[in-house]
Amino acid sequence: MEKNTNTNHTSDDNNDKNHTNEEQEKIILNPNFEDGLNNWTGRACKIVLHESMDSGKIVPLSGKVFAAATQRKDTWNGIQQEISGRFRRKRVYEVTAVVRIFGNNVTSATVQATLWVLNANKREQYIVIANVQATDKNWVELKGKFVIHGSPSRVILYLEGPPPRADILLNSLVVQHAKRNRPSPPPFYENPGFGVNIVENSEVLDGGTKPWFTLGNCKLSVGQGAPRTLPPMARDTLGPHKPLGGNYIVVTNRTQTWMGPAQMITDKIKLFLTYQISAWVKLGVGVSGSSMSPQNVNIALSVDNQWVNGGQVEVTVGDTWHEIAGSFRLEKQPQNVMVYVQGPGAGIDLMIAALQIFPVDRRERVRCLKRQVDEVRKRDIVLKFSGLNDDESFDLFPYIVKVKQTYNSFPVGTCINRTDIDNEDFVDFFTKNFNWAVFGNELKWYATEAERGKVNYQDADDMLDLCIGNNINVRGHCIFWEVESTVQPWVRQLNKTDLMNAVQKRLTDLLTRYKGKFKHYDVNNEMLHGSFYQDRLGKGVRALMFNIAHKLDPSPLLFVNDYHVEDGDDPRSSPEKYIKLVLDLEAQGATVGGIGIQGHIDSPVGAIVCSALDMLSVLGRPIWFTELDVSSSNEYVRGEDLEVMLWEAFAHPSVEGIMLWGFWELSMSRENANLVEGEGEVNEAGKRFLEVKQEWLSHAYGIINDESEFTFRGYHGTYAVEICTPAGIVLKTFVVEKGDTPLVISIDLSSL
């Protein structure tokens, strides 16, 4: 089936220009308490009206009065208003509240705006709108958006968050239609200087260290004997480069982890350009005879005193130079930008060579990848015809062949949530543009069994039915999650025996219920970042999870899944450590069927991503990007980020699928990551996504040659061919699978 790529999704429900006068739309009644506390109630607490509090120190920011939610006994207690019947489904609303806290010696706390939604089937839902850090000193503004996809029976908006016995003060709360702002134009880069290092004296060739300076009381000097070639990832981006001089910066007398060399680069940074960072680093034993255990080295930026990660690597003290790589992008004009190197423990000498920071020409990288894609994702196809007329009419009326690919079989999927599928516009875009799906939370253990013994798979069942009904394959995410903060409280409280029994029951319930329905499972999510089950049940429990899952349902591929594997940002999840994890699991008998790279990435650089893919390829397992999302305030830059990742994955022979972690505004975990606005308009990033998908469809046009053949090279997938003959038009379809040899398709025209 051909995937429709329409970029407008509107209906009578969201065509407000014809149906609603926005000035008459009142979602919140009595928003400024001019009518006392009418329409407002306490959520399991008392609410009172004040002109002032604390001996006149607290007065309204606007108006004459404010409300206080008091005598709160739990964090979810607060002030609320029911808005049932006053909002419109599929319409994006903006909430603006002026809040403050008071009492119980709490000087600062999070205040959160939440929607409680009761659906027609009695299913409860909590939607976090926004939160803000409130204080007892000043009023602050809480601002956020929400959209309701379905037609619930009740909806209540309330404030919550601070510790018990601390009052929530509310001066005003307004809800209005959130109009979409016109997107910013694509950035214009005048003389971007692609590939030009903005770090001064990075090779310290003259033996001096200016303009470098130290953070702290450490000392800088110059050493000799560093590698004379650029690190591999920089070399991959920059191409041929003159040999380096071999000098390097030596940092000694370090008494704190943050001590190291620094340099100001404020005036050299251009907004919205993506910069690659690269260097050689090495550690030496300092005067204190420091620890020989692995140490973290971090190249960082201080952007107006805010830390920005520029890459991290784990290094052992010794004679070996290690590559460190990363990337960054700034989208707001800073006052000061400083690059610095930090990380190893006190007393350890730090050595840095050939630090490079340069803007990357990502479009040129994509052009190169397209040539690589032709080798990896396409196949030669020969349409061999029989039954052609042998008379002279063939020369007078050649047979014209039109080939159109209707479907690319490469998996491109997305995350969906249960509430999303109540919106028919969401479902329309989803089913037309994706061939795989994964559930955001609905299959996770904390969702299916929040309370011990109360198992509910209804949401997952609803979503699975939608996918199966539209021939969309589904990944199972996830059976377990190894990070302790994601484990529901009742599981955390179990003793060792009960926990093992609960683990085995979870496996049996899930894998038996859905046997044969999920194509993949993420067995134990994020094992490089957590160890809840391993710490309590022993190292062998991880392999046991894989083994039991495989026995219960042998059909799905069983995946490991983790984040920051592909970007150089986190030494805990480097490709080398991921490889070791997989090999350890397999040594214990686990059947690891696939490697999941989540792909929550900032300012992606192709050479860094490709390096990780190359390393992981040695495992010989299919690699999937399982949770890909990118973020930029500029929709064009966001689209470029996504394009970089799509082509990088598509061009690598070991990558067998890409899953986006959502696409619809307010249904994603990251801000400025959506491809479709909350009311259905495809934004510039979404348009770029659809354009790339169109590029992944092959078309051919020509005539049958003297050998009764028509040849072309095309992507794997489904095709329709139209043959125009003197006797009429013939229509055929065929499928191109992966293969190293030309695919011959025989077509008989003798019946004409």
From Swiss-Prot:
Region (Disordered): 1-22
Gene3D superfamilies the record matches: Galactose-binding domain-like (2.60.120.260), Glycosidases (3.20.20.80)
Pathway: Glycan degradation; xylan degradation
Domain GH10, first and last residues per copy: 397-692
Annotated Pfam families: CBM_4_9, Glyco_hydro_10
EC number(s) reported in the record: 3.2.1.8
Keyword Calcium: no
Main EC class the enzyme belongs to: hydrolase
Boundaries of every CBM-cenC domain copy: 26-163, 197-344
Family: Belongs to the glycosyl hydrolase 10 (cellulase F) family.
Role noted for this protein: Binds to and hydrolyzes insoluble and soluble xylan substrates.
Name by which UniProt lists this protein: Endo-1,4-beta-xylanase 3
Species, as recorded: Arabidopsis thaliana (Mouse-ear cress)
